[in-house]
A protein has these predicted regions:
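Amphipathic, coiled-coil-like alpha-helical segments
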Residues: 1-16, 42, 46, 54, ...
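Alpha-solenoid HEAT/Armadillo repeat architecture
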Residues: 19-22, 38-41, 60
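Alpha-helical segments in soluble extracytoplasmic regions
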Residues: 22-32
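Short, well-ordered alpha-helical segments
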Residues: 28-29, 43-59
Length: 95
């Protein structure tokens, strides 16, 4: 997997969560985040792994009613910022 592939997968998840909200999170989304976090770790994206893991853990807590949407929103925004920064870094390399 390339960074671009990870970025596009994360962006899809971010868009889906933004559209549907955290109340409709399914286990498949959480599992996908966990797999993406593992790949991020393998390719040395420590901050990406941390942010993805934070969102995944928060989503699990929301499913278990141990956390609320506000907590998920903060993690989602942090991950979205990171993903956009990855896109910006790639654009700079092309110049």
């Amino acid at each position: 997997m390339t960074i671009e592939f990870l970025r596009s997968e994360l962006k899809r998840i971010i868009i889906a969560l933004t559209a549907s909200g955290f109340d409709r999170v399914n286990s498949g989304t959480v599992e996908k985040l966990d797999k993406i976090a593992a790949v991020a770790e393998m390719i040395g994206m420590k901050e990406g792994k941390r942010l993805i893991g934070n969102l995944s853990n928060t989503m699990k807590a929301i499913q278990e009613r141990k956390s609320g949407a506000a907590s998920g929103t903060v993690r989602l925004m942090a991950l979205d910022f990171y993903v956009e920064k990855l896109a910006g870094d790639e654009d700079m390399e092309e110049l």
